[in-house]
């Protein structure tokens, strides 16, 4: 990086003899002072271009010989700081930050697909990801093969020599199905196919995706990381097993697609990382207690939360995600009218489409994030009119429970 002043030239911080815990790493830079003046937060570099010392210096930057920023569409010190902070919390070889989760998904798929190739994925997938695969990549000659990922035999039959990647969500939204990552990785890797996982619903700090066979994670950092829904963002966490992710992203797609994270978003999300662990533990604990209480409400026909011991995915979820199940759950009422009525009467829980805000949120998936699909398509995806999705925030569980009860009984 260019020297701003000679204040220790970003002197390294003192490191502990043992590896620090993730909660500490999330608040420490671990590699240098972030600012020439000793600021405790990385400054926001709101500029489009960066000056070079010589013409050769400029050439070396543009050809990748030195890691200095040349243009904010592909590199910015504030964003690089955020990427390095995320990398320090994982075993990743590379981390790339984008301006949304969907941009991260599109980028990682474009690292592998081309005409004649196919993507093997779940028949339970986020609506915009489905649209990306069918409506954007489909006309370019890329086939999408949707299978039940719980049926490992079906997955094995779907993967062939033309498969570009296996793509999944670790917990489907809103079906709450949990993918067996290790089993799916074995199937994919037998054909030298990468396993790409959208891990938005469980923070990457809570489990070791690489140890389970995941080759790259995509994350909507808009969710848990942004801390209060303050900024859009997405991440690719690349474990280096398929070099084309780094090569194509760094030297092609960032230049050509214009999907790089903004400096302000990187600043906000670096700050969000510092409190991620504490917020997640509180939100997931509240989600579990609320789910337990709602099981006793007669008007609620089903509570779907993988942290409940009677959930069919409980053991797999606990094994993969370190005895945690996240802050999203769904409830089913008698019919659509009852579900809509409950949502309309909520006073504490907000009607909004985001996930993992500091505030709790309620959504009717069938009429919102899956509204573009026909009734028969939604039923095939197990998205039902009776379902309400709840994203649990930092409110007290007593207030959330009372809000739902009052909405049912009023």
Each PLM stretch: what is its role?
Residues 59-65, 346, 404-407:
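Short Gly/aromatic-enriched secondary-structure transition segments
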Residues 20-45, 236:
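Short conserved active-site loop signatures built around small residues
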Residues 49, 54-103, 128, 132-135:
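Conserved N-terminal alpha-helix of the aminotransferase class I/II PLP-enzyme fold
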Residues 26-33, 94-299, 304:
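Conserved PLP-enzyme active-site core in the AAT-like
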Residues 7-10, 15-19, 134, 140-143, ...:
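PLP-dependent enzyme catalytic core of the Aspartate aminotransferase-like
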Residues 31-33, 46-52, 223, 275, ...:
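Glycine-rich beta-alpha junction loops
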Residues 302-388, 392:
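Conserved C-terminal alpha-helix-loop-beta "cap" of PLP-dependent enzymes
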